[in-house]
Curated annotation (Swiss-Prot):
InterPro entries the record matches: Photo_alph_chp2
The protein, known as: Uncharacterized 30.4 kDa protein in puhA 5'region
Domain of life: Bacteria
């Protein structure tokens, strides 16, 4: 698949479908009980193992096929960690709600505690990606995972510092306490930096694609360009009044008491609970 427009559309579909599939499985597990979350994570292990095997096998493949395999393998590994996190299986030692009037330092330490195991897992996964492909010709699996990782870190920090729009309806029961660690604010100092860096990264990938000497390198950088642009879009969703949650809510099983789609900003208040 060498057509960049078709590659871009396929990347958007993979982003939308993989997100929806994880949210669907998490919602089903929520309706079935806590043990179902563990079954989801164990049952999803082929995503993790298969993803790493595919990434290692694609490390010396600089063709178009190699670029696609590397990209999808990184998404597969990332998807398992997202499933494990949203299931509450690989999250953090702190499962308590954050007190409404906690200091910034206390909030930060508590927030780190809610994510610690997940972050350690992602860093370890990123290092393993580097080990598997570093001596090969095809590094697109590593760059894909790194893009997802740093974009997610940026999003988490922005939620902690405060943004106007926070979707809480996708938070599963094991992570209901996370909402108390978010903060509403009209803006924070990091958001413009995040937007600038992601925009610059998108432009850099695009420039690399334009200068590519082979089809494999060209497609690899097209994949990274679209993925980073989607990460940029997800950041804008935290600010712009767009019903982005409707991209996935229609496919999810209904619950008796669904959370609000978007928690509205209330000055001086930290949202608590789901």
């Amino acid at each position: 698949m060498n057509n960049p427009w078709l590659v871009a559309l396929t990347t958007i579909f993979v982003w939308w479908f993989s997100t929806g599939a994880i949210l669907w499985r998490i919602r089903r597990a929520d309706l079935s009980g806590r043990a179902a979350h563990m079954r989801s994570v164990v049952g999803g292990l082929p995503l993790l193992i298969g993803g790493y095997i595919a990434m290692a096998n694609s490390a010396d493949d600089s063709s178009v096929r190699g670029a696609h395999v590397a990209f999808l393998s990184a998404v597969s590994v990332w998807g398992w960690f997202e499933l494990a996190f949203l299931s509450g299986v690989v999250a953090g030692p702190n499962r308590d709600h954050c007190p409404p009037f906690a200091s910034m330092t206390e909030r930060f330490l508590r927030s780190v505690g809610t994510l610690l195991w997940h972050e350690i897992g992602l860093i370890s996964a990123l290092i393993l990606c580097a080990v598997l492909v570093w001596t090969g010709e095809n590094h697109f699996g590593l760059w894909t995972f790194a893009t997802l990782f740093f974009a997610r870190v940026s999003a988490k920090l922005n939620l902690f510092l405060g943004v106007p729009r926070i979707n809480t309806q996708f938070l599963p029961k094991p992570l209901a306490h996370l909402a108390s660690h978010f903060r509403h604010a009209r803006m924070n100092f990091l958001f413009p930096v995040s937007i600038t860096v992601l925009t610059f990264a998108t432009g850099c990938w695009m420039e690399r694609a334009a200068d590519a000497q082979t089809d494999g390198i060209f497609i690899g950088f097209v994949l990274l360009t679209v993925l980073t642009a989607l990460a940029l879009l997800e950041h804008w969703f935290m600010v712009l009044p767009l019903p982005d949650q409707k991209l996935w809510t229609w496919m999810l099983p209904s619950v008796e008491d669904p959370a609000e789609t978007v928690a509205e900003p209330v000055p001086g208040r930290i949202p608590v609970g789901e």
